[in-house]
Structure formats: structure tokens, C-alpha cells
């Protein structure tokens, strides 16, 4: 028989073990914090003054997301918020993150950013989330630290390995030491914004696969709110089981009446300008007129990026606000000013991503822009007939452009194509903004379209499927 160890010796042994583990755990945490992207969290200094929803706007969609978070009977663990470029997804994610933080729902957040090196790749995603989890769920801190102290190479392992060693196993260890119900009052929402801003479509698909497996295989207790543009590879990932069964989708469309919110935003911001501008006493009244505000609302096409860009341009203490608004409307020459630089940068990035098919895509854009006034129902089938394209090829050509235009699915060929942004036409037809690569010369485009119409009408035996399906709505 083994000799009986006196109780006081056991206590001393446990105390020694604890004293050894504490510095070891702290060393592991220090290693972790060297391999994170601290600027990715919702309240980081790097993201000072991040975009968020203007007061009294986006109330319906914010409430829908918060209802999903608190619904204890829901069957889904992912909420995918998607919509066109510039629709305001990041502002909604930021506002939800702040609301969740206030209510102690937020476990962690990661805001991807295409232009910042440690926030545009998958490499630091899990370590950054873990660094936030050890604060929001302190019971796992020691277990995470010891795991990294014992095996620092975890910091360069795959995302799956990191989730298992730094999230799953620490949660299991904390459950053993703290009881099965220790997570009942801990935050369980993880927010990921701008998934499409992570480099490489393969990385974006991989992230979704890893997160899905963390729920499906390891049953981690978290729910994920993700936001992105509706890029083809992301849509396809969410369409496949089991992720499709685990996901609630929210599309930012006209259901949420964005024009109403944009009007509220513009009216509020113009009031701020009138109250704060150094020459406010001399501003005309009323300014701007209701008609001018309505023009801006219509030009925004439901996308907040246009409205916010306009306000940033006009809200300058060094310029006369009515003159700046005239530049926006094209009444006054813009000179060297670049009022739409932010929007132009967005359009350029999206169009460059479709570079393999850009020449044909621009032909399609020209048809949409210059036949629009004929009130035609311009469907994929019509485009293929008019441009003599192979049947079905339109869906391939436009597959990377879903963030700036509505493209029906292949089994909805009778639905029309349309731009999400009315301002896209202004960009494409302004050489100073779109440059040599994407510029559409109005005269050349009109001439080419007329020549196509004449050629096809003069050659009825050519086998053309051309017909003009006038819109009935």
C-alpha cells in the first residue's frame, strides 16, 4: 500500500502547484497578446470614431438582430447580415457591438479592414478573439495561459487547432472547475464584420468552415453575427449544409425602408451644419430645400455611403456650404476637389476584382445605363440576345459584382438586372473619376447601341433572339 500523505502535505503540494501555474499562465498570456490584432475590436483606439448608426435610424433591423440574440428558442447560431457595398453594414455591426457590450452579451469582436495588414488576413483572427474571451470569460484565462506556456507553437497553428486548444479545451477545463452552469451569465455573442475584406476568397470560406465546425463538432456556446457583401463564394458557403441550417439571413433591402433613414440622417446633419458653421448667420433660409434633400435621398439609392460622403464634403468650415452642395449637384465646377473620393475608391476596388470579365461587364453596364430611359425590362436573357453572348454567360460575367448590382439567379432569368447605386452611372461616365480602364464614353456607347439595334433589325435571318421586353412595372 502507498503511504498515506498527510492532509497538510496535500495542501502544500496544491499550493505549490498553483504558485507555479500562475506565472506560467501569465507568460502564456503575454505570448498570446504579441500575436493579436488589438485594433480589430469594436472599441479599439485604432478604430476611433468608427461608423455607427445615426440616432433614430436603422431601428427596425437593429431590433431584429437584438431579438435574435435574446431568443432562447432559436435554432440558428449564425446571423449573416449582407447587402450592397456602402449599405451601412459596418455601422450596424458597430452599433450592435456597442449594445451587446452594454448588456454584457458581447464575448468578442473582430472588424476586418482591407487596408490594415493585421486585420485583412485570417492569421490573427482566433488569437484576437481568444485575447478578448479571457477578459469577458475570466474563468478560462489561466487555462489559456498554461496551454500557450506549454505549447507556444499554437500561435502559428491552423485556426482549427487554435480553437480546440485555446477555446474548446479551456472551456471544458473551466466547466470542470467552476461547474456546468458557469457560462449561464457569461457573454456569448461574437461579432465579425467585413468578412469580404479578409484577403483571398479561400480564406473567407475557410473561416466560415472553421466557425461552423466549432459549433457542429465542438458545441462551443457562442453565437456569431457576421456581415459581408454578398460575394459569390460567401453566398455559396452559406448555401451548403450544415451551415445553411445554422444560419439566419438578414438582407439589407427595401424592406427596412432605407430612404426614410437616409432622409432623417441628411436632415439632422444639415441642421448640425447650419448650427455650427462659422457663417451660419448668413446661410440662406430655407437651405437646403426639401427638393434638394429629396434629390440626395434618391441619389443614395438606399445606400448610406453616398449620403455620408456628401455630408463630409459639405461640412467644411473653410467653404461656403451652398457652394459645396452645388458642386455635388454638378451646378458648379468641382475644380480640384474630389467630393466622391471614398465612393470612387469603393467602385474601383469592386470593378478591379472582376477584371477577368471587365470588358464584357462594361458592355452590360452600357446597356443598363443607356437603355434605361426606354423603360425596358433588361433581363440576363435580353442582355445575351442584345450583345450576342452565349446563353447563361451573364451570370458568370457578373458573379463578382453582386455588391453593386442586383443579379437574379440562373432560374430567375426573367427578372431584371439593375444597379444598386444610382451614383455608379455618374462614376462610369466621368473620366476623371473612373479613369481609362472603366470609363464609358456616352457618345461612343450610344453609337454602339444604335448600331447593334440597326444591325439586328436589318438581319432578321441572323438567328438573333433579340426582343424588347418593355417593363410592366
Locations of the language-model features?
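Acidic, metal/cofactor-coordinating or nucleic-acid-engaging core segments within structured domains
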Residues: 458
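Conserved NB-ARC/NACHT P-loop NTPase core of NLR-like innate immune receptors
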Residues: 2-455, 464, 469
